[in-house]
């Protein structure tokens, strides 16, 4: 835990917190960003407000499944982070509460759009592009080139050298499928995924698992959000990232208040705090380098430069629909995951 950053965030949010000090005593949060970020959010918020934070860490697919299971008796107040598609699905299913923050005009257009297309049942809190992580030491040792396009990943040389998450549990992997469908067309995308399957060593439960495996020399290449790479590198691991030259998608990490929250005042207070620049800066403090949604948040130089990335016009509304997500994942299970490796 970075004590300097905690002190900074404490000072930055103290004035905001005082007005709410005695109003809310507990908030229950599902956190779908990396563990270090979740932990710092919990610590800083509790110290600045005196509110008890009960935080569970789950991937976005698992988080959505939990909210569905608890819909008649919600035990969660806020869902923080994770890819935006399942947040849109939660909105569609009536699992999240419509709420318009006064801070909305201060957010980037993509974050506001996420709120608008959900009926204000979610909001964008960060964005990050999909790409590849690779271990330069392993690639050199195995005499493998750096993959630069989606097509490169199909080369026989990469057999058993690639990890990606399982789309049934990971929003990262679902973003990959939705990106490929939009980039190639659906049938061609699934033919691609069948060929890619031959080179996959493991489908992990978590979207961050593959890039951590790359950093630790357990695999050569991952399909990951590239903002997860610099944090591993800052810890001394040999890892680099690249976005495919033929185009890629980006996530809009989101935040939602759960409909039926037992601690609604506390949920709204945490929601407002999480949109402030000082709270959003906690991501970089824990070596997470997504692009923050608040325009005034200081952007770390290690955050990917979106201007240098070939991004597709990702249809967040369509691929955030429950039926579309279910259909695409079921097709992947039937046509891809069932194949031998």
Regions found by a protein language model. Give the residues of each.
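Periplasmic-binding protein-like
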Residues: 128, 192-197, 203-204, 235-259, ...
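N-terminal signal peptide c-region/cleavage motif recognized by signal peptidases
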Residues: 17-22
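Early extracytoplasmic/lumenal segment of secretory-pathway proteins
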Residues: 25-89
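Mature extracytoplasmic/periplasmic domains
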Residues: 258-316
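A ligand-binding cleft/hinge motif common to bilobed small-molecule-binding domains
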Residues: 85-89, 215, 220-238
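Extracytoplasmic ligand-binding site segments that recognize negatively charged/polar headgroups
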Residues: 33-39, 75-218
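Conserved C-terminal helix/tail region of periplasmic/extracytoplasmic solute-binding proteins
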Residues: 314-341
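Bacterial N-terminal signal peptides that target proteins for export
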Residues: 1-10
